């Protein structure tokens, strides 16, 4: 039997499980103002890695958070439902959602096209990317953030 070819991904920053284990998160506010003090954008209680600057926070929240259509979760991570049983939708509220959206999409397309040697390699790829995005070791070009 032929050995499956594909990308092997060794972990450097993460261990199997939660790729965010070694990252400290905090709630912040993001506010963008005009020179005259008028508010262009404001969003409160967003979750960001604690090592990020306020400028990085403002860029992430104002430019790259999805502003609508995202299932909302309660404090335990359960999807909120309205009185009809439909998902309650709203904005992204955590940079984890953005990192997950990107890394999971890249993994999906990599697996779909046979890019990885195994599903474990695909998981390692996803986890390592999530960590690198959260620690600002890597970042895609701007259009990737919006998709």
Regions found by a protein language model. Name each.
Residues 1-147:
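Extended catalytic cores of very large enzyme megasubunits
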């Amino acid at each position: 039997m032929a050995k499956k070819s594909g990308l092997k991904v060794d972990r450097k920053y993460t261990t199997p499980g939660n790729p965010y284990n070694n990252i400290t998160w905090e709630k912040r506010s993001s506010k963008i103002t005009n020179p005259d003090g008028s508010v262009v954008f404001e969003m409160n209680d967003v979750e960001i890695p604690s090592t990020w600057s306020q400028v990085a926070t403002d860029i992430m929240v104002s430019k790259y958070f999805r502003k609508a259509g995202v299932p909302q979760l309660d404090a335990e991570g359960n999807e909120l439902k309205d009185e009809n049983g439909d998902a309650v939708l709203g904005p992204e509220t955590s940079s984890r959602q953005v990192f997950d959206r990107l890394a999971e999409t890249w993994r999906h397309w990599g697996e779909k096209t046979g890019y990885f040697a195994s599903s474990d390699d695909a998981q390692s790829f996803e986890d390592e990317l999530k960590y690198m995005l959260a620690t600002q070791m890597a970042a895609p070009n701007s259009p990737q953030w919006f998709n």
